């Protein structure tokens, strides 16, 4: 039998060393990947508990296994809190990820070969919005809209023109690298004009939506998905939301289980419930407001130092920096900043001359540094360091200096304080 005192130390030191090294990296590096954040110890406590052991195929009150009376309560808590947080009538907390939530939406509401209209990956969309390499681009006839290259903003006239031309069954609104506010009423009007469903993927901005600092898509969309990490600061997982519609609710439930998944991850659902409770607290709005202020402060520095911020600035938690003018690649910038313990990700920019493996841009987000306690002053200083490195990318002395400054910041702003 197992002992309550079993631990990794002394049993699997090789694995433990890698895990400890990652913990140290998170403390010693500044995290600017827009899709990453730090979960609270409460969230991790819930995810690391005994619910890991429980199989619970089905939904609360309608399980295919016995012994589910307690996990039913856990899942109902998560559902009720998600509905309250976003003002939704329906919530499904079982998707294992944002991508699996999106796949379930397609499975529920589309047939193979149906036309979908989504944002191009090259212009800031997501793989699951119809990219050719994704199942969403292989199973469905995916048409892509993008940005007006003159303004860096979504070209809603193009969206409408493509919708009228291709008559999609579904229009997808959402992004992975767009720094401005989506016009949900305009998307709804376009969808209604051509008789399409409107599906919103708000994975990146869900925390801002929950705080009332970004428009809520629930009143406009037929279905909404999100991840539960990123700006929500929860565990890695997915969530589907909708207004009351019995037909759509039944289709969505069936698409998640048994259509796309088997047993739900009850320990992750418990962690989602904690995350939603944290997001319902008054302080969560203060956090999200600081996320936006920090992003705006960084964008101002980049623009002031001569870097092109796609779309001209940011309304949310992220920004996309084009390095075309500087003659740099995203890959080189990613590596140089990483050597200075600043973590970003290379990212394609509109009309990128480089391949997706090289790119001409970097994406930067402020959720994680804001969780650490950074405010505008720290973020302006940080943006300046990034510019220092990119301005003199082949000078190792600059990188070494910045790495020392990063270390001071990280010691002053620990991820998990004592």
UniProtKB/Swiss-Prot annotation:
- A Gene Ontology biological process annotation? glycine biosynthetic process from serine
Q: A single GO CC term, please? A: cytosol
Site (described: Plays an important role in substrate specificity):
229
Q: What is its EC number?
A: 2.1.2.1
Q: In which pathway does it act?
A: One-carbon metabolism; tetrahydrofolate interconversion; Amino-acid biosynthesis; glycine biosynthesis; glycine from L-serine: step 1/1
- Is Isomerase included in the keywords of this UniProt record? no
Q: Which residues bind (6S)-5,6,7,8-tetrahydrofolate?
A: 121, 125-127, 355-357
Keywords, ordered alphabetically: Amino-acid biosynthesis, Cytoplasm, One-carbon metabolism, Pyridoxal phosphate, Transferase
Entry's localization field: Cytoplasm
Under catalytic activity, the entry for this protein gives: (6R)-5,10-methylene-5,6,7,8-tetrahydrofolate + glycine + H2O = (6S)-5,6,7,8-tetrahydrofolate + L-serine
- The N6-(pyridoxal phosphate)lysine modification is found at 230
Any one GO MF term held by the record is: pyridoxal phosphate binding
Q: Which cofactor does it need?
A: pyridoxal 5'-phosphate
Q: What does this protein do?
A: Catalyzes the reversible interconversion of serine and glycine with tetrahydrofolate (THF) serving as the one-carbon carrier. This reaction serves as the major source of one-carbon groups required for the biosynthesis of purines, thymidylate, methionine, and other important biomolecules. Also exhibits THF-independent aldolase activity toward beta-hydroxyamino acids, producing glycine and aldehydes, via a retro-aldol mechanism.
Q: HAMAP family given for it?
A: SHMT
Family designation: Belongs to the SHMT family.
Q: Summarize the subunit comment.
A: Homodimer.
Instruction: Tell me what this protein is called.
Output: Serine hydroxymethyltransferase 2
Species per Swiss-Prot/TrEMBL record: Pseudomonas aeruginosa (strain ATCC 15692 / DSM 22644 / CIP 104116 / JCM 14847 / LMG 12228 / 1C / PRS 101 / PAO1)
Protein encoded by which gene: glyA2
